[in-house]
Amino acid sequence: MRYRQLATGTLALGVILLIDVLRVWLPGIITIFGQAASTPAELMGAFALGWFVLALAAPAVVRRVGARPVTVVAAVVLAVARLVLTTAPGGRTQLWLATAGLLAGLVWLVGTAADTDRPVPGLALGFAVNAALHAVLDTVDLVWRGDWVAWLLSSVAVALFLLGAALPGTRAGAALPGTRAGAALPGTRAGGGGARAWLLAGPVLLLSGMVALSPALARTGMSYLFVGDGVARSPLFGMAPVPVAVAGFLFTALTRPPSRWGRAYGPVALLVGAVLFALNRGDLLLAAILLAAVGLGACLARTDDASRPENGTVSASAADPVGTAATSDRTGDRTVGGRAAARRGYAVAAGMLVFALGAVGYYSAYDLGYPNAAVPVLVAGLIAVVAFADPSVVAWRPGPFPPLRTAGAVTALALLAPVLADEVPVASNRDGPPERLTVVAYNIRMGFGLDGRFDLTGLTEAVRQQRPDVVLLSEVDRAWLLNGGHDTLDLLADRLGMPYVFGPAADPVWGDAVLSRWPVTDPRTLPLPAVGAPTGAQALAVTLDLGDGVRTAVVSTHLQPPPGQGPVVQARAVADFAIGYAAGRPLVVAGDLNTEPGDEAFGQFTNAGLADALTAARPLATSPADEPREQINHIFVSPGLTPSDPVAVRSTASDHLPVAVTLTLPPR
């Protein structure tokens, strides 16, 4: 069956809008519905999974009502929700808008699956274009921008999607010339065409968002190439891997899969990429991305039932525009087409449930403390098995768009990212050495404010108004799909004009950072003992080169207390590491220490000879940001550094307040 270009474009646009909604909905689970590290992860996981389980009822609704009315209504709800989310309302309004858009998107996928037996071109195009746009937008989606450009582009995308959904005939196309709908081609057999491809929609969405087509992960991977020893720095051309990954994914997805032994390269590449990602090593991220991208595309191509005769059976509507296909929809399992449509609907609903299970299973580990490395490997294994399930491809036919030109066009879009989205701030000590340093320590909660909005502006202003020389950040997220796939560190560094050094804690993309307007040398990271804490912790040490041989050591950390205890063991480890690293030079240790003045963990720093730089302003509560009650964000300094003007800056751009202090350096 000839798959129409309009159907492919509409499917791709719908996928793009659904991913946009997901990037708002997923962070809302841990910032609005609940709070990471305080709300039980089981409760947040149940909330997330419930909507995907509910979507399993959609195929029955489609079979009873008919695909077209269900698809059109769901498309309208998805489009409206996506457009309204551009206002970034925050709070419960944002959460329920995104939830409505998500559920509508799932139902729309089921309805589309009932009428689309060759979804691979549309799915692949949607995933690839979304990744390219995400890269060009520097991982800040239109939803969070709110300016006239965001509204214009969002409105155009929504209008085109609704137009495609409303036009008649935007389905899987007519029967092949010379055949009737439902007729088998010579040498082929009837079956549920497209079901395997639809089953993979959810798993491919998960791995493309986490690994293969993640611009934030690509930039993070590039940042690990400049230092080594598990530390990352501001990279040159951080987005350069994105066009390569997009090209590899889209070209392999749209071209004829190899036969015989060549058909194994896709599953093998995908599995190797997933394993490299699961090893949690920053220096392996680029290889994981490129292998996973090519592997995902090749596996999708293996499920492209372009030669199946059932491609004609399902779309009787195309052969009978008068409307008998609608009757066929309502008769359900009495026809081959009805059974095939139902299989596709249940397949895509089940595949999206796999997406939810994988996402919840992977990210809940950071609250519950179990190993999660197997999750991406298991999802990759599922994709590989489905791709291998039926190796017979008889008379493969090209899709609606030429593979080479299509991949080239989307790659050209992605190539704009290194030009438009890559900024590299430069540090200099030409004006040094200074007499004073202003230090800011801030737990940025992955970039999300108390209302659940991705609030780069608020974070930037809270820091910038202190005119800092060095900024120490905690809870820095650089690519988690759960948080929308942003590289929050690079975004803040660009806006503050300060290069960064990053130390991984929970995994290669979540940890602590130091931003400095002075050159930084000798970065080191120390993994801290977990002692029962579910989330990993580390201490990142750097040396500020202030000019004329003047050096100051800075250590950024985020202590993770064991359940019901204080982070005493970690505090002692950080204090010992910092004192040894400084080796007599002036020293600053700061971050979210999860301990209060007078606690045993707090005493580990003072017992090591460090002074509380915020003493003059005590009590100085910093959490929660809207009603501060706890003093858990601190700055310690070595003797010889004289603190002044300590302050906790009022802001709700995070759930913590930033603390700042000015330090007078020892006389030279």
State where each predicted segment sits.
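Structured beta-strand-rich core segments of catalytic domains in phosphoester-bond hydrolases
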Residues: 369-373, 423-426, 431, 451, ...
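N-terminal post-signal-peptidase region of extra-cytosolic proteins
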Residues: 452-457, 485, 618-625
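Mobile, glycine- and charge-enriched loop segments
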Residues: 408-453, 585-586
